[in-house]
Amino acid sequence: MAMPKLTYEEAGVNVQEGQRAVNLMKESVKSTFTKGVLGDIGGFGGLFALDPREMEKPILVAGTDGVGTKLKLAFMMNRHDTIGEDCVAMCVNDILCQGAKPLFFLDYIATGKLKAEVVAEIVQGIANGCKKAGCALIGGETAEMPGFYQKGEYDVAGFTVGMVEEKNLITGKEISQGDIMIGISSSGVHSNGFSLVRKLFFEDKQYSVDQYVDGLGETLGEALLRPTKIYVKPILEVLQQEKIKGMVHVTGGGFYENIPRILPEGIDANVHLDTWQAPPIFQFIQQEGQIEQDEMFSTFNMGIGMIVVVERSAGEKVVQLLQELGEEASIIGEMVRGSKQVVLCQK
């Protein structure tokens, strides 16, 4: 008896559904295109033309990241239109810390069974993030991998390249005693600490994502899924007017792991806890989980998504500039003699 002929679709890969996803996302992708983009959607590689007249000695800065287990929350809520924005934010905010202006972005989406509408929603979020960052979405990969992911789940990762003038590269090496830290508010939990959050709320406490929380003024799911803020445009505007010595994207590891990444030898960062109040979502997490302060600051951004370090004399002006650009910003600490430690203290 002849064996039935096997097809790729019978093995779990639907090429037609993949093409339908491409068709659904085309307009979103094209809406991000900037003057440097060459070619159209569907090429083997994304093309981007650098303008050599823009900088004397341009340095390319690259970054890659994902969204982590915040994706699980998107699955629980069956909402996929913001998680792509998180992915862009995690990448572009990182390269921004070295003064780089993002030029272009590529994405990677992998799932067990491809649903064109879900992929299109994810890409819409990526496109929204790219537009907020002023960069172009020039390529990506959507992988259907049967048997690899749980039903209805997927993973998202991104990659970005930006450019900075060599003399304007920000490394933190110039940070010195007396410099001050300016904290710029986050939009919420951003994209870190979700393994703790999910265990606390949805395993231990048995909350629902649809549960309204009085202290938050919204459902728990809405508060947690809010996209990571993208700081590119306000920071680049500040850099046109003032010198920034160092920048910290407060992500995984919170204050304790991220601030030391820019500290030179012989310097500590004193963070003044009485200069801002952690937003309600962090107070709720700490209260419900009976979590120690150090653990909170080791895990979450605590309401501060980006920190910039400037000379003390420029502090008030930079704060004012950021506020004029629509950001909540304040001086939250200073650099002192030490050994590359982060010290939580009162002003």
UniProtKB/Swiss-Prot annotation:
First-tier enzyme category under EC: ligase
GO BP terms, alphabetized: 'de novo' IMP biosynthetic process; adenine biosynthetic process
Superkingdom of the organism of origin: Bacteria
GO CC aspect terms: cytosol
EC number of this enzyme: 6.3.3.1
Keywords, comma-separated and alphabetical: ATP-binding, Cytoplasm, Ligase, Nucleotide-binding, Purine biosynthesis
Gene Ontology molecular-function annotations: ATP binding; phosphoribosylamine-glycine ligase activity; phosphoribosylformylglycinamidine cyclo-ligase activity
InterPro entries reported in the protein's UniProt record: PurM-like_C_dom (IPR010918), PurM-like_C_sf (IPR036676), PurM-like_N (IPR016188), PurM-like_N_sf (IPR036921), PurM_cligase (IPR004733)
Subcellular location: Cytoplasm
Annotated pathway: Purine metabolism; IMP biosynthesis via de novo pathway; 5-amino-1-(5-phospho-D-ribosyl)imidazole from N(2)-formyl-N(1)-(5-phospho-D-ribosyl)glycinamide: step 2/2
Alphabetized Pfam families for the sequence: AIRS, AIRS_C
CDD domains hit by this protein: PurM
Reactions this protein catalyses: 2-formamido-N(1)-(5-O-phospho-beta-D-ribosyl)acetamidine + ATP = 5-amino-1-(5-phospho-beta-D-ribosyl)imidazole + ADP + phosphate + H(+)
Family (UniProt): Belongs to the AIR synthase family.
Protein name, as recorded: Phosphoribosylformylglycinamidine cyclo-ligase
